[in-house]
């Protein structure tokens, strides 16, 4: 017996997409560059930093060939400030803007040299290329970048933090404290997601404006998709049955009034 397909993207598929995020490593030994589908990687020369996809960085870390530098947001100071701001607001904090690079300085110049493009990247029709997750370089380390005024979390924050805490906890500062803050942030944001169920009724019937999901992470959307879509479908069916009952009552009332009119005409 075949089971029905899950609604939306599964957690394992979301984790797979997160593994394409770029992170910064410090190699322990020399390695030649690789020809990947996303483009070639630069040769690894210790102790020079390099940017690699997360899946490759985790593989080298397990083989003890490299150390992974934690992203700029994966530290106790940043996460504590984000936790406080998330607690003080009823809505999700906004993510970093897509048209504003989260890194400036050496990383940007190195990527420009590798790609051969000195100016901003363009699409085939000449428009400015604006990448989206997991192709936003929000998890690379750049010493020359300036910290943003307001804390934010990347789109794949939960998956990336979980994988780094499992595989590269020795490369993080105070990993136990980071794990605790991540758990607190996750609980607060899931509580906010559960509050959104009050909008599902109006959205399912058709009179609502939709669910505001700006700032929600990939794994959070994946976890809530099954419940939200199932609840919306149930409420839609309930609303349809109510409309059908009201329609039948209206039709029955019209028939009853027509019968009364016919009786009056016969008496005359």
From Swiss-Prot:
Its main location: nucleus. Residues 245-259 have a biased composition (Basic and acidic residues). It comes from the Eukaryota. Residues 245-268 are annotated as: Disordered. Disulfide bonds: none annotated. Gene3D superfamilies: 1.20.58.1020, 3.40.5.50. The keyword Nucleus applies. The keyword Nucleus applies. It is found in: Nucleus. Keywords: Chromosome partition, DNA replication, Nucleus. One of its GO terms (cellular component) is GINS complex. GO terms for biological process: chromosome segregation; DNA replication; double-strand break repair via break-induced replication. SUPFAM superfamilies: GINS helical bundle-like, PriA/YqbF domain. Belongs to the GINS2/PSF2 family. The GINS complex plays an essential role in the initiation of DNA replication. Has a role in chromosome segregation. Component of the GINS complex which is a heterotetramer of SLD5, PSF1, PSF2 and PSF3. This is DNA replication complex GINS protein PSF2. It comes from Coccidioides immitis (strain RS) (Valley fever fungus).
């Amino acid at each position: 017996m075949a089971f029905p397909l899950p609604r939306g993207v599964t957690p394992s598929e979301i984790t797979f997409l997160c593994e394409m995020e770029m992170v910064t490593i410090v190699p322990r030994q020399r390695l030649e560059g690789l020809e990947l589908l996303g483009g070639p990687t630069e040769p690894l020369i210790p102790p020079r930093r390099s940017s690699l996809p997360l899946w490759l960085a985790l593989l080298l870390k397990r083989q003890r060939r490299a150390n992974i530098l934690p992203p700029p947001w994966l530290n106790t100071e940043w996460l504590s400030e984000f936790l406080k701001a998330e607690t003080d607001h009823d809505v999700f904090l906004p993510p970093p803007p897509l048209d504003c690079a989260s890194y400036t300085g050496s990383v940007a110049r190195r990527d420009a040299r590798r790609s051969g493009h000195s100016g901003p990247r363009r699409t085939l029709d000449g428009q400015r290329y604006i990448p989206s997750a997991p192709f936003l370089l929000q998890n690379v380390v750049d010493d020359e970048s300036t910290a943003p005024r307001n804390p934010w979390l990347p789109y794949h924050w939960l998956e990336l933090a979980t994988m780094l805490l499992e595989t590269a906890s020795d490369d993080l500062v105070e990993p136990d404290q980071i794990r605790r803050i991540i758990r607190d942030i996750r609980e607060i944001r899931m509580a906010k997601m559960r509050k959104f169920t009050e909008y599902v009724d109006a959205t399912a019937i058709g009179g609502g404006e939709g669910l505001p999901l700006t700032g929600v992470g990939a794994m959070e959307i994946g976890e809530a998709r099954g419940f939200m879509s199932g609840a919306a479908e149930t409420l839609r069916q309930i609303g349809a049955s109510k409309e059908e009952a009201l329609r039948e009552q209206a039709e029955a009332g019209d028939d009853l009034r027509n019968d009364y009119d016919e009786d009056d005409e016969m008496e005359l």
